[in-house]
Each structure stands twice: as C-alpha cells, then as structure tokens.
Amino acid sequence: DKPHYSLRNTDISQLIQSALSNDMTIGLHSSYQAGIAPTLIKKEKTWLEKNVERSIRFNRHHFLASREPEDMTHLEADGITDDFTMGYADVAGFRLGTSYPVRWINPVTRRLSSILLHPLTIMDCTLEEKKYMGLNYEEALAYSLNLIEQVKNTGGELTLLWHNTSAQENTDSYLRKLYSHLLNELAKK
C-alpha cells in the first residue's frame, strides 16, 4: 500500500510547504501494512518526520483499520497523541457515541491512555458508495447537515474525511459539490 505520489514531486512538495507555512498540522496516515504489523508505525512516522522536518503527533489508520490493543500501544509508544480513525466506513455518525474526543482505554491493562480518539463524523465514500449508505446528493447533503447541526448543538468536534480523489472535476460523483457546499455552510456557523 504505497503512496501514489512522491514527496519529492513538485506539486506535493509545494502543498507540504504551503501547509507548514500556514501553520497547518500534518499527521501520519499509517499504511495498510502497519495495520497488520504495528511495529511499522514507528518507521513510517520517523520517515514522515524526516521529510516534513516536524514532529508528528496525529494519526489515522488506512481503511479505518485499527487492531486494538496492538495499534494503540504502538501509537502511544511512538509518540502519537491523537488518533482520527474512530469511525465506521458503512455509516456516518458517532461511532464513539459522542462528538467529543475521548481517551483510549487499554482493554487488556484497563489503563487510561494518553491517546485521544477523535470521532470521525463524515467520510465522503460512506455517503455515496452503494456498499455503504448509497445516498444521492440531496440525501447526503441533508444527512451531513443534520450531523453538523448535532455537533454544533453539543459543542463537539466535527471531523470530515474527504479523499483527494473526491475533489476531482469531471467525474460522475457528487462528492466535490457536496464538500464545497458543506464548507460554505461551516463558514457561516
């Protein structure tokens, strides 16, 4: 599960520099292989830190795949403080039952971890793909706005996951249009 791009690519390099110069946070998107062999997390994190010249504290597992407790214990040992994996691929909403970050509890040791789990509220493909919710544009917009309103009413944290391929023009997908609509709505709030 290798990236489809190189960090040395001019466009990617400019994107990283723009993110860093605008004080944006860069996190690790740990690989599918790291989900199978959590010892790879440290190697991937170290590689990313070397390339962006910043300490990496945030993570999201590829395919929202997380094997507890192995993944979390490795994340914690490797200096990750926040994980954004906690969501279901097949339904948007509140997997943790809340829109607030919570600390992970190791089920083996029953120890309260230093890692904060941030609930993933909405993932692009969850809304559109037939194998998941399979919503049309109007349904996806209404569903998303309802979730956003719930987060606003509780003072929680909204986490959106939009893949770069969903932002492409000239596709049959409504996801680019939906993303733009949601960002405009959020800017009003």
Q: Where do the protein language model's features map onto the residues?
A:
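Metal-dependent polysaccharide deacetylase catalytic core of the NodB/CE4 family, i.e.
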Residues: 1-66, 164
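A general structural detector for well-ordered alpha-helical segments in enzyme core domains, enriched
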Residues: 11-15, 40-48, 71, 143, ...
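C-terminal domain-boundary segment and adjacent tail
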Residues: 19-23, 141-189
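Short acidic (Asp/Glu) and glycine-rich catalytic loops that position anionic groups and cofactors
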Residues: 24-25, 123-128, 161
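Histidine/acidic-residue-rich catalytic or RNA/ligand-binding cores of hydrolases
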Residues: 37-43, 68-74, 94-100, 170-180
